[in-house]
Each structure stands twice: as C-alpha cells, then as structure tokens.
C-alpha cells in the first residue's frame, strides 16, 4: 500500500498530534517523524533578557521584519555543516507559509539578513523550527521580538522541540511528553494571531515588556 503523499496539510495534522519531521542531513531524502520523550518549550513569561542583551536591543541599528523573506530565512537556517533541512522539508514549509501557517521573523543589517527564526502556527501554539545568527546576538534579538509578538497575539505554547544549552540560558525548559501533549491540546482549542491588529513593537518596549513578565 502506497503511503499518502507528504503535503503541507498532512504536516499540519502531524503537528496537531505533537509530531514533527526531520531529516538526518540535507542529502538524506528520508523524513523521520519525531515525538520526543521530553520536550523543550519556552514559557512565554519566562524569556530571560540579560543586561547586555537589553542594551543590544535598545541601541541596535538592525531592523526586524516579519514574513518578508520566509524562504531566505529557511535557507539561512540550513546554511551550516549539519542540517536536518533537506529539499523536501524546505518545500513543505514554504507550502505551509503559503497557507498562512508558517512564519519568519528576520533581523536585518541594511538589506542583509543577519539573524532570524521561523516556525509553524496552529491554534495558540507556535512550533519553533530553526534559527540562525550571522552577527553576535542576532538570533537572541530575533527570539526577543518573536516572544513579544507571541504574547501580544494570544499564544500560550512555544514549542522548541528540543532543549539546547543556548535555549536554556534564555529561559527555555524541558517537560515530559504527557505534559506537553496536555498543553498542546489546550493550545489547539483556542485561536491566536501572529500579526495582531495594532501591534507595532519598538526595541525599548520589547525590553520593557519582557522585564515585566520574566
């Protein structure tokens, strides 16, 4: 029996079940489905902005954009020696972006992408897929602006898939699979906006709101 074709809509169904895809490498055509025993999440009221990062954000000469170069952001995330983003995964997420279920946040120095993050939205859940940094702290700046946006839009779950030391230093935690699936079910029952009406963040307000909630 031939398995169903892997499409963006089928991918959304997998996310709703708490499963996400990965490839072993960019050259591996196979897709593996993952449901970790322990899951990384970012409590949206627990993002830690250090004093040095707060200064960087307040004084930065970078600009932050949203959904202006989704494909470029995914390519930049894959531009490393080892990556799980193969051509099939790239195609699927570009398809999700066209459906309005995948978004990018870019950090720019002039016209150049120097940092960014992308992920999938479903209900009140945001599934962070990957991020990149071509300048010191650029990915941290992207996360700060992303989390501020998720809070403003009514999101309740930020899934980081795995917990890395870098994410842990910024406030991410690890929870058991059963706890994750409970939180996911609650998030899927609601609705959130990645582009909430009237939301227009500036660097100082992002730092201020983060210090009030963390």
Swiss-Prot record:
Region: Disordered, residue numbers: 194-214
Stored InterPro entries: Acyl_CoA_acyltransferase, Leu/Phe-tRNA_Trfase, Leu/Phe-tRNA_Trfase_C
Main subcellular localisation: cytoplasm
Protein name: Leucyl/phenylalanyl-tRNA--protein transferase
UniProt EC number: 2.3.2.6
A cellular-component GO term for this protein: cytoplasm
Organism per entry: Cereibacter sphaeroides (strain ATCC 17025 / ATH 2.4.3)
Keywords tagged on the record: Acyltransferase, Cytoplasm, Transferase
Entry GO MF terms: leucyl-tRNA--protein transferase activity
GO biological process terms on file: protein catabolic process
Subcellular location: Cytoplasm
Listed Gene3D superfamilies: Leucyl/phenylalanyl-tRNA-protein transferase, C-terminal domain (3.40.630.70)
Catalytic activity from the UniProt record: N-terminal L-lysyl-[protein] + L-leucyl-tRNA(Leu) = N-terminal L-leucyl-L-lysyl-[protein] + tRNA(Leu) + H(+); N-terminal L-arginyl-[protein] + L-leucyl-tRNA(Leu) = N-terminal L-leucyl-L-arginyl-[protein] + tRNA(Leu) + H(+); L-phenylalanyl-tRNA(Phe) + an N-terminal L-alpha-aminoacyl-[protein] = an N-terminal L-phenylalanyl-L-alpha-aminoacyl-[protein] + tRNA(Phe)
The family this protein is said to belong to: Belongs to the L/F-transferase family.
Role of this protein: Functions in the N-end rule pathway of protein degradation where it conjugates Leu, Phe and, less efficiently, Met from aminoacyl-tRNAs to the N-termini of proteins containing an N-terminal arginine or lysine.
Entry-linked SUPFAM superfamilies: Acyl-CoA N-acyltransferases (Nat) (SSF55729)
Coiled coil ranges: none
């Amino acid at each position: 029996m031939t398995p169903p074709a892997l499409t963006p809509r089928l991918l959304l169904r997998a996310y709703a079940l708490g499963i996400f895809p990965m490839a072993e490498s960019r050259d591996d055509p196979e897709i593996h489905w993952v449901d970790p025993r322990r899951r990384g999440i970012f409590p949206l009221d627990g993002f830690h902005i250090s004093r040095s990062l707060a200064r960087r954000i307040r004084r930065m000469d970078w600009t932050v954009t949203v959904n202006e170069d989704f494909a470029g952001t995914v390519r930049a995330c894959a531009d490393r020696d080892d990556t799980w983003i193969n051509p099939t995964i790239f195609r699927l997420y570009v398809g999700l972006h066209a459906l309005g279920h995948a978004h990018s946040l870019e950090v720019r120095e002039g016209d150049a992408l120097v940092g960014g993050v992308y992920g999938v939205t479903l209900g009140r859940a945001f599934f962070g897929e990957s991020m990149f940094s071509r300048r010191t702290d650029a990915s941290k700046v992207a996360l700060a602006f992303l989390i501020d946006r998720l809070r403003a839009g009514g999101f309740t779950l930020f899934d980081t898939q795995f917990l890395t030391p870098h994410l842990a230093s910024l406030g991410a935690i690890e929870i058991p699979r059963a706890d994750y699936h409970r939180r996911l079910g609650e998030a899927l029952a609601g609705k959130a906006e990645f582009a909430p009406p009237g939301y227009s963040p500036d660097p100082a307000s992002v730092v201020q709101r983060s210090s009030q909630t963390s």
